[in-house]
Amino acid sequence: MNKITRSLIIFNIFCVVCAQQSKALKPGSERSEGKGPFKRMVIRGGTLINGDGSPPIGPVDIVIENNRINRVQSVGYPGVPINENRRPKKGDFEIDASGHYILPGFVDLHAHAGSPQKAPDTDYVYKLWLAHGVTTVRGVGLANLEFSLSEKNRSKLNTITAPRIWAYQRPGQGKDWRGGRVQDPQAARKWVRYA
């Protein structure tokens, strides 16, 4: 191989590597769809499969207050008219789940938000999770530290359409971290305070 051909190959490889490095993971877009959060939401008349292996129960009314399930109230029996006296009071927002099954949100314990090369648009990843019933993710390296903490906070504030995010990072990550590798308890404490 002559010098010019070899130089062109090396230059092209260098350009490809630099182009890949310059891409960045795109944070979630500001929320433009969906409803909520609500101070008090009630899901009415559904059949609950609670995930513990017991048979489905229902119809039930589920009361969600301040983004937490507050109460699951049995309001009758299948095939029998619902006893209106057993129903919880009205919510700010209500969903009629009659004839539908209600499942708890799934939790993905090992999640990544994508990568600039494969899935640079986190909106796609977040909506894919939500569409499959995943309402909480444990990001084990969701992305870099700063990105992960920012997305976690934005999800908590409900400014993006995304599941709840729990950011679990590898000790020693962070663009401003100057403590080197975390290899002992003192360095671990220092990094936790940093993060």
What are these regions (language model features)?
Residues 8-16:
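Bacterial N-terminal signal peptides
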Residues 25-28, 33-39, 48, 52-103:
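Histidine-rich, glycine-flanked metal-binding segment
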Residues 1-9:
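Bacterial N-terminal signal peptides that target proteins for export
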Residues 118:
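Short coil/turn segments
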Residues 19-20, 24:
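Boundary at the C-terminal end of the N-terminal hydrophobic targeting segment
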Residues 113-114:
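Short active-site segment of divalent metal-dependent hydrolases/proteases
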